[in-house]
């Protein structure tokens, strides 16, 4: 098994980490096996990355036969779109390293918890936007093939988890057009 950390540089000078839990293939048992992968996006209100939604989740997926990756994305004081671009890069990295990490590049899912659910849903809904294409990303390479949302922050409207949007947007927290853009419903 491989356990490693890849650094992702944020556009604001921050550093995210992609932590991999990868099952190696055995020459005795299907040495060319490709496994599905899952990118785990912990919650924490864009203030922290919850430990309980990180490695414990990765180990459960690993035990189920997935190559598991945890994104420790940048939180406060980083603001939108830093974490979105970090998740975009993480999805791209998983597919770029599919051979090395024994990943079936057509079966890469994402799971997000709370604010991490917002981040995962956000990438899924904007993966083909011009901003990401202009940054050099192929929409097909960054959009998850499946999405699991666990108690996600979805709306920025009346029922919003205000703390998550305050942390994500900082001074832009009252910008109606930005709030609308980031409201996933």
Question: What are the residue ranges of the model-derived segments?
Answer:
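Alpha/beta-hydrolase superfamily serine-hydrolase fold, recognizing
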Residues: 1-185
């Amino acid at each position: 098994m491989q356990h490693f950390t890849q650094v992702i540089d944020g556009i604001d000078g921050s550093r995210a980490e992609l932590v991999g839990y990868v099952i190696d293939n055995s020459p005795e048992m299907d040495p060319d096996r490709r496994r599905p992968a899952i990118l785990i996006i912990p919650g924490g209100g864009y203030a922290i990355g919850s430990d309980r939604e990180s490695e414990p989740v990765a180990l459960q997926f690993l035990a189920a036969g997935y190559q598991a990756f945890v994104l420790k994305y940048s939180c406060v004081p980083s603001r939108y779109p830093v974490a979105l671009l970090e998740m975009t890069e993480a999805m791209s990295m998983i597919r770029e390293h599919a051979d090395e990490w024994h990943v079936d590049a057509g079966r890469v899912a994402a799971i997000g918890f709370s604010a991490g659910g917002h981040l995962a849903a956000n990438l899924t809904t904007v993966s083909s936007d011009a901003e990401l294409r202009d940054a050099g990303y192929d929409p097909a390479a960054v959009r998850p093939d499946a999405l699991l949302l666990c108690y996600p922050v979805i709306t920025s409207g009346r029922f919003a988890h205000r703390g998550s949007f305050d942390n994500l947007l900082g001074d832009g927290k009252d910008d109606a057009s930005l709030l609308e853009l980031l409201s996933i419903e």
